[in-house]
């Protein structure tokens, strides 16, 4: 297998009330981004890791994450765009020419495991597109603009989508280019593939695979890491 991992670390931390990007905040003595990369770095199938950063944080990432710790894989560091979707496109645009599969992961999800990543990669080889997620536990309501309930979808068919999301390289590149040409902005990568008429296979993940968004998430993540 020849897999490239794209780790997206170019987001803004507006809900953290901190000047430092959340992926560089510390959990158990190491940056959030360290843990997000580490699980991919330990997988034999993955041949390279591409880290997408904010333009103003490229040097900081290089010095405080990529050069500070020992890694097995070669790295590329790429500057991100104004939106996550553009950052992902910048990352997938520089994958190795021999790459068959691209695994895209949020740098703010430090609790992802090797096992989940590998299951998603295997699913992508079989189905061309796979996304990690978990069945929702709560009842979900669809509301109108005035916060009145319009509908209650059947919970049996609802999943909360996480990352990684893994795709055949040619498919995800085409999907991103199509979205760019048409001015479509999605909330994740799988929706871009869905727009092309492809089915995306769901791979059950872990409820612990949270995205660090608030200060409380840092506390929760550290508790899980120390277990």
UniProtKB/Swiss-Prot annotation:
- What GO biological process terms does the UniProt entry carry, in alphabetical order? isopentenyl diphosphate biosynthetic process, methylerythritol 4-phosphate pathway
Q: Which reaction does it catalyse?
A: 2-C-methyl-D-erythritol 4-phosphate + CTP + H(+) = 4-CDP-2-C-methyl-D-erythritol + diphosphate
Q: Which UniProt keywords apply?
A: Isoprene biosynthesis, Nucleotidyltransferase, Transferase
Taxonomic superkingdom: Bacteria
InterPro entries tied to this protein: IspD, IspD/TarI, IspD/TarI_cytidylyltransf_bact, Nucleotide-diphossugar_trans
**Top-level EC class:** transferase
Q: What's the name of the protein?
A: 2-C-methyl-D-erythritol 4-phosphate cytidylyltransferase
The species this protein belongs to is Caldanaerobacter subterraneus subsp. tengcongensis (strain DSM 15242 / JCM 11007 / NBRC 100824 / MB4) (Thermoanaerobacter tengcongensis)
Taxonomic lineage of the native organism: Bacteria, Bacillati, Bacillota, Clostridia, Thermoanaerobacterales
